[in-house]
């Protein structure tokens, strides 16, 4: 077995799927670790081609020899909730002004999508996490 590569850094970014380019925030974040920026952009865009337009968080592991690997995460719960509710943004005063309503079924569906990234043991616990996010955005869960 080949010797393990030493990890030089871990970079977490949220980039719109299929639209990674060397401009900020991608370029500077990768540049300071010495990663080939264009190589990452091409690989990321190819991997996220099917989800164009959605924000996809990515965790990039940079090794000492300047090579890298990346893991794609599920879209942020807030973005999924906004899409489900059909609104552009959450409430400025979430506990005073409510901007939209989502059903428990929609919340469970989002929890199913996010379950790999959530720190929950079952779907009910994951749904409660998503419902909490909705509440803090001024979205009512019914």
Curated annotation (Swiss-Prot):
GO biological process: translation
CC annotations in GO: cytosolic large ribosomal subunit
Modifications the protein undergoes after translation, according to the UniProt entry: One or more lysine residues are methylated.
Pfam families, sorted: Ribosomal_L11, Ribosomal_L11_N
Record's keyword terms, sorted: Methylation, Ribonucleoprotein, Ribosomal protein, RNA-binding, rRNA-binding
SMART domains, per the entry: RL11 (SM00649)
Molecular-function GO terms, alphabetical: large ribosomal subunit rRNA binding; structural constituent of ribosome
Function of the protein: Forms part of the ribosomal stalk which helps the ribosome interact with GTP-bound translation factors.
Family: Belongs to the universal ribosomal protein uL11 family.
PANTHER family with a match to the protein in the record: 60S RIBOSOMAL PROTEIN L12, LARGE RIBOSOMAL SUBUNIT PROTEIN UL11M
Record-linked HAMAP family: Ribosomal_uL11 (MF_00736)
Subunit structure of this chain's protein: Part of the ribosomal stalk of the 50S ribosomal subunit. Interacts with L10 and the large rRNA to form the base of the stalk. L10 forms an elongated spine to which L12 dimers bind in a sequential fashion forming a multimeric L10(L12)X complex.
Protein name: Large ribosomal subunit protein uL11
Organism of derivation: Mycobacterium marinum (strain ATCC BAA-535 / M)
């Amino acid at each position: 077995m080949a010797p393990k590569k030493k990890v030089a850094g871990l970079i977490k970014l949220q980039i719109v799927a299929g639209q990674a380019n060397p401009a900020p925030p991608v370029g500077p974040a990768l540049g300071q670790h010495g990663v080939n920026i264009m190589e990452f952009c091409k690989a990321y865009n190819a991997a996220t081609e099917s989800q164009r337009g959605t924000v996809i968080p990515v965790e990039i592991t940079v090794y000492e020899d300047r090579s890298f690997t990346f893991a794609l995460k599920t879209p942020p719960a807030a973005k999924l909730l906004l899409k489900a509710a059909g609104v552009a943004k959450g409430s400025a005063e979430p506990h005073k002004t409510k901007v939209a309503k989502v059903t428990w079924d929609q919340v469970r569906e989002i929890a199913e999508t996010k379950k790999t990234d959530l720190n929950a043991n079952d779907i009910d616990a994951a749904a409660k996490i998503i419902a909490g996010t909705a509440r803090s955005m001024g979205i009512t869960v019914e």
